């Protein structure tokens, strides 16, 4: 595909569209976990009285439903499932149906979540409806992201960067929306309703952006040239892009420029190598080359999802009740995590250390397991076994800074190193494997969160 023949992206409309699509894909997950106090208060029997739901640093008196854990697990299991089913779906369901259908389904399910703010119901049915919504929303999100990654694989890598930038802002956007809801001064029920309507508006904008792409000459040029190799490229691009997405954690746009080696400028070179295509690389051979890097990726996400947000969302301020104690968790847990994780991912734009041959990488990854007891020993009032050894707010903030930066950097580093450990024709298989291990790490972490919470 000759890049010189491509039309210009007038007013950067295609870039803006993919940025908004990136933002829309991760808004649901981020808005659910950031609103944990709201859900836990409803499940604790607060009914429809939201007067103290969004205005206090309250995580539920007992959290008998283990909402933190279940919302994390039921968000990540669909990712693992659809990672395995993606190749089947891509062959059987047209791309437009996958993308537009997923967006509409997410919109309707989130509208249901917003409507429930006004509905008074007992905790049991509310929990069941919410968990079903979480599961279905994240199933559709997994299909949506995989399909959009396929489209991005046919376009210049700049648009992958813009897409990831949008996804990277989703967590920050959700945290800011929560803070604005709490500080708005309106009654709490209206505040909660406005909070949950916000992602609906984001999804609507995503639908408009997707529908506008066929009407933009620049998008038509690249998407019309989608060849039979697009599905293979989709898997490879997806693995490199997914370094940030499925757990709602932001990504560095600079990092993508490093990892997306298959730019469109290099695509023409792959076509003359068509005779090599019958020699499909062995999955086992590729796994032997990247197994340590893949294991590191699994362990990084296992540690992160085992305590975030299941444990970290339960940490409260040790100061006397006031404005700071109300805003402590949204700021120090969610906003701080998303910002520092993004900065951690950005570091790989400037250096990649340790390299793929170093044994220091597994050591650094294993050291992150120390964060599990550190967070468990912070100021979590709802506990029956472990003592509180780090009651001051400064401890939690320091741990969160290091936790978030290390997560962002090590995830970005492992996803960057994996393609360098295999031959060019093996990258498709390596990409599919890394995508699977990413989803596996998220699911393992979400499952372990039940154990760690029980040990508190």
Swiss-Prot record:
Tissues expressing the protein: Highly expressed in skeletal muscle. Expressed in liver, lung, placenta, brain, heart, kidney and ovarian tissues. Expressed in testis at the blood-brain-barrier.
One GO BP annotation of this record: neurotransmitter transport
Modified residues (Phosphoserine): 252
Gene this chain is encoded by: SLC29A2
Entry annotated with the keyword Transit peptide: no
MF GO annotations: adenine transmembrane transporter activity; cytidine transmembrane transporter activity; guanine transmembrane transporter activity; neurotransmitter transmembrane transporter activity; nucleobase transmembrane transporter activity; nucleoside transmembrane transporter activity; purine nucleoside transmembrane transporter activity; uracil transmembrane transporter activity
Family per similarity comment: Belongs to the SLC29A/ENT transporter (TC 2.A.57) family.
Transmembrane segments: 13-33, 70-90, 99-119, 124-144, 162-182, 193-213, 291-311, 324-344, 360-380, 386-406, 432-452
Modification after translation (UniProt): Glycosylated.
Impact reported for residue 455 to R: Reduces drastically localization at the cell surface. No effect on uptake of adenosine and thymidine. Reduces drastically localization at the cell surface and induces an significant reduction of adenosine or thymidine uptake
Topology within the bilayer: Multi-pass membrane protein
Major localisation: membrane
UniProt cross-references to Pfam families, sorted A to Z: Nucleoside_tran
Other observations noted: Transport activity is insensitive to nanomolar concentrations of the inhibitor nitrobenzylmercaptopurine riboside (NBMPR). Inhibited by higher concentrations of NBMPR (1uM-10uM).
Matching PANTHER family: EQUILIBRATIVE NUCLEOSIDE TRANSPORTER, EQUILIBRATIVE NUCLEOSIDE TRANSPORTER 2
One cellular-component annotation, GO: basolateral plasma membrane
Name the record gives this protein: Equilibrative nucleoside transporter 2
Organism of derivation: Homo sapiens (Human)
């Amino acid at each position: 595909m000759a890049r010189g023949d491509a039309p210009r992206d007038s007013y950067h409309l295609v870039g803006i569209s993919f940025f908004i699509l990136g933002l829309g894909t991760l808004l649901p997950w981020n808005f659910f976990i950031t609103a944990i106090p709201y859900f836990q208060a409803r499940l604790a029997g607060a009914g429809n009285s939201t007067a103290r739901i969004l205005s206090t640093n309250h995580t539920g008196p007992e959290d008998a439903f283990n909402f933190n854990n279940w919302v994390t697990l039921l968000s990540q299991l669909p990712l693992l499932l659809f990672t395995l089913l993606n190749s089947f779906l891509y062959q059987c369901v047209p791309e437009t149906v996958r993308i537009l259908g997923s967006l509409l389904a997410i919109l309707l399910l989130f509208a249901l979540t917003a409507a429930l703010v006004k509905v008074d119901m007992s905790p049991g049915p509310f929990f069941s409806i919410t968990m079903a919504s979480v599961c279905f929303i994240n199933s559709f999100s997994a299909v949506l992201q995989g399909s959009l990654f396929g489209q991005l694989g046919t376009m210049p890598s700049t648009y992958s960067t813009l897409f990831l930038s949008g996804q990277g802002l989703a967590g920050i956007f959700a945290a800011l929306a929560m803070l604005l809801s709490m500080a708005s001064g309106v009654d709490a029920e209206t505040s909660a309703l406005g909070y949950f309507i916000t992602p609906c508006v984001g999804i609507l904008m995503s639908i408009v952006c997707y529908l506008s792409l066929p009407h933009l000459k620049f998008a038509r040029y690249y998407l019309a040239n989608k060849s039979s190799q697009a599905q293979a490229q989709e898997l490879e691009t997806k693995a490199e892009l997914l370094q940030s997405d499925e757990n709602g954690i932001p990504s560095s746009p600079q990092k993508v420029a490093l990892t997306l080696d298959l730019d469109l400028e290099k695509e023409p070179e792959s076509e003359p190598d068509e005779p090599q295509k019958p020699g499909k690389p062995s999955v086992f051979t590729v796994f032997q080359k990247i197994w340590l890097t893949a294991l590191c990726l699994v362990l990084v996400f296992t540690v992160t999802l085992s305590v975030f947000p299941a444990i970290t969302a339960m940490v409260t301020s040790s100061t006397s009740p006031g404005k700071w104690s109300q805003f402590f968790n949204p700021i120090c847990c969610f906003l701080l995590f998303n910002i520092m994780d993004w900065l951690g991912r950005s570091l790989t734009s400037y250096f990649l250390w340790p390299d793929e041959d170093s044994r220091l990488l597994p050591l650094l990854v294993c050291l992150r397991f120390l964060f599990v007891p550190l967070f468990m020993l912070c100021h979590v009032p709802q506990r029956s076994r472990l003592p509180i050894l780090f009651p001051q707010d400064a401890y939690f903030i320091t741990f969160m800074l290091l936790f978030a930066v290390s997560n962002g950097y090590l995830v970005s580093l492992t996803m960057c190193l994996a393609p360098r450990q295999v031959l060019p024709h093996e990258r498709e298989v390596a990409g599919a494997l890394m995508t699977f291990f990413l989803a596996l790490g998220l699911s393992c972490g979400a499952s372990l969160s039940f154990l760690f919470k029980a040990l508190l």
